[in-house]
């Protein structure tokens, strides 16, 4: 099945403690159904000091379920993603506006 959300997409969080926050997808794990969004679902990780790393408390974005994310369309509103065949190629389409993503 084709991916509805991809790396670089602007998304909004629909549920959870970060509801309403917007960000860009930095990585997607389709097999786990999760994505990492910049600035969303931040956790503090304690790292030990080493020669290359200073150590301490480091904020790190954690994965979030794809079902809890919605793509932002050109108007800045959350939209669902559909697919359409154009010129023999399968393209992603915003359901609210019908624009090709």
UniProtKB/Swiss-Prot annotation:
Does the entry feature the keyword DNA-binding, yes or no? no
Keywords for this protein? Ribonucleoprotein, Ribosomal protein, RNA-binding, rRNA-binding
Gene Ontology MF, one: structural constituent of ribosome
Instruction: Give one Pfam hit by family name.
Output: ribosomal_L24
Indicate the quaternary assembly.
Part of the 50S ribosomal subunit.
Q: Which PANTHER family match?
A: MITOCHONDRIAL RIBOSOMAL PROTEIN L24
| Protein purpose | One of two assembly initiator proteins, it binds directly to the 5'-end of the 23S rRNA, where it nucleates assembly of the 50S subunit.
Q: What is this protein called?
A: Large ribosomal subunit protein uL24
Q: Which organism is it from?
A: Jannaschia sp. (strain CCS1)
Which lineage do the record's taxonomy fields give for this organism? Bacteria, Pseudomonadati, Pseudomonadota, Alphaproteobacteria, Rhodobacterales
Q: What gene name is listed for this protein?
A: rplX
């Amino acid at each position: 099945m084709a991916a509805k959300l991809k790396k670089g997409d602007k998304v909004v969080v629909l549920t959870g403690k970060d509801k309403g926050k917007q960000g860009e997808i930095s990585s997607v794990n389709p097999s786990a159904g999760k994505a990492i969004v910049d600035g969303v679902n931040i956790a503090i990780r304690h790292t030990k000091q080493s020669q290359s790393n200073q150590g301490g408390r480091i904020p790190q974005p954690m994965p979030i379920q794809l079902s809890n994310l919605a793509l932002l369309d050109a108007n800045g509103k959350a939209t669902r993603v559909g697919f359409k065949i154009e010129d023999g190629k399968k393209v992603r389409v915003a359901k609210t506006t019908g624009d090709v993503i």
